[in-house]
């Protein structure tokens, strides 16, 4: 049942004490027009190598941004820069050594928080699949998951796009691995939000699938909001977490109280289901979640597993369809049967570079449930590691 564990855990190695202090003066985003910045991403990392030429390194990255500060030693250099392309920056720095402790903050998003009139912040991790326009519209704050191909480290949806991820998934010699955001990432997010919001709700992957919930909880214990703060287990993944987040975000927009929000969250989680169909089991097998023998047997029998989240937060098969032809047509009928005679408020459809199938599903479900809000999004890279190319997920939120 290795396929049931969605996320791997990981720890950042402790670094020896070195002088990595920056003399630069931080920008006050309250006093500048952040939207007009040419280089909106405040980016930091550690470069570990042999005899790192810091002056040359500085000149190399100069065209990529401004506010450059490099500190440390010849073997460990900490880099700070404001850039518009963190991915290219990290790729460039990798020519000087191993890039670790990547950190990227979007100053435009921080500025929106400063200007927001809301009193309650909503935080999710990047496994919550929602279209970017909905995340921005409802001021939903995202802490990204980490992933790596061998020694190449990436920040989910920040330093690797979906297109880049799936290209690497198909061609890299290394099958990617994921790790939950470290507590420091959550703590930095919470500390910033505590200066601009009275309360926070942080919604994450099931505790039994990932250490994300635990890391978020550990970080929040060290930050104090003026009114209320809580971590919620979504008991869902991907678009399932997405529809729950949307319900809470709309309630926050309507100034619902914190106790009412937590009650609403419990009810919404109970009313949410997600179903996932994999085009192939290749990613599952390569990731060590399914033995070669079991994969061969499933393929030989022509079985298509349909996965879902149990009430305990476990990802398990909830059914099968038969025959390798028209997999997603059969999956569509499976989900429609599950939803038969039920009143549906929201439907989230996600895909792993399978947009045509996702759009076809959208048309079908909009026709079947004309009163429901329907959205389409990509499977984030952190989940694409396990779902693989072509996967389709459908989340249903019942009234």
What are these regions (language model features)?
Residues 121-185:
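N-terminal glycine-rich anion-binding loop in soluble enzyme alpha/beta folds
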């Amino acid at each position: 049942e290795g396929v049931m564990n969605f996320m791997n855990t990981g720890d950042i190695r402790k670094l020896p004490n070195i002088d990595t202090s920056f003399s630069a003066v931080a920008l006050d985003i309250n006093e500048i027009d952040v939207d007009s910045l040419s280089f909106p991403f405040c980016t930091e990392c550690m470069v570990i190598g042999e005899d790192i030429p810091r002056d040359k390194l500085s000149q190399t990255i100069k065209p990529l941004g401004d506010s450059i500060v490099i500190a440390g030693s010849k073997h460990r250099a900490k880099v700070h820069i404001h850039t518009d392309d963190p991915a290219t920056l990290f790729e460039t720095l990798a020519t000087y050594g191993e890039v670790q402790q990547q950190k990227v903050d979007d100053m435009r998003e921080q500025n929106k928080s400063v200007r927001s009139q809301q009193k309650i912040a909503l935080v999710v991790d990047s496994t919550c699949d929602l279209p970017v326009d909905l995340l921005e519209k409802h001021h939903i704050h995202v802490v990204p998951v980490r992933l790596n191909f061998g020694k190449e480290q990436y920040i989910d949806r920040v330093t690797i796009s979906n297109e880049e991820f799936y290209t690497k998934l198909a061609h890299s010699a290394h099958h990617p691995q994921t790790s939950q955001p470290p507590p420091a990432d959550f703590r930095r997010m919470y500390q910033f939000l505590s200066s601009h919001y009275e309360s926070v709700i942080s919604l994450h992957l099931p505790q039994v699938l990932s250490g994300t919930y635990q890391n978020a909880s550990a970080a929040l214990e060290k930050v104090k909001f003026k009114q209320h703060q809580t971590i919620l287990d979504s008991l869902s993944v991907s678009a399932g977490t997405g529809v729950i987040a949307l319900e809470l975000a709309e309630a926050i927009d309507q100034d619902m109280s914190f106790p009412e929000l937590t009650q609403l969250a419990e009810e919404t989680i109970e009313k949410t289901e997600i179903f996932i169909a994999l085009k192939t089991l290749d990613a599952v097998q390569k990731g060590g979640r399914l033995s070669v023998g079991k994969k061969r047997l499933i393929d030989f029998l022509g079985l298509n597993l349909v996965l879902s989240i149990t009430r305990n937060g476990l990802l398990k098969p909830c059914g099968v369809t038969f025959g390798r032809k028209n997999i997603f047509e059969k999956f569509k009928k499976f989900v429609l049967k599950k939803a038969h005679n039920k009143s549906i408020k929201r439907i989230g459809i996600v895909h792993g570079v399978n947009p045509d199938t996702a759009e076809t599903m959208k048309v079908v479900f909009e026709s079947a449930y004309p009163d429901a809000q329907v959205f389409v999004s990509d499977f984030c890279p952190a989940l694409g590691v396990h779902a693989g190319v072509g996967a389709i997920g459908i989340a249903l939120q019942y009234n």
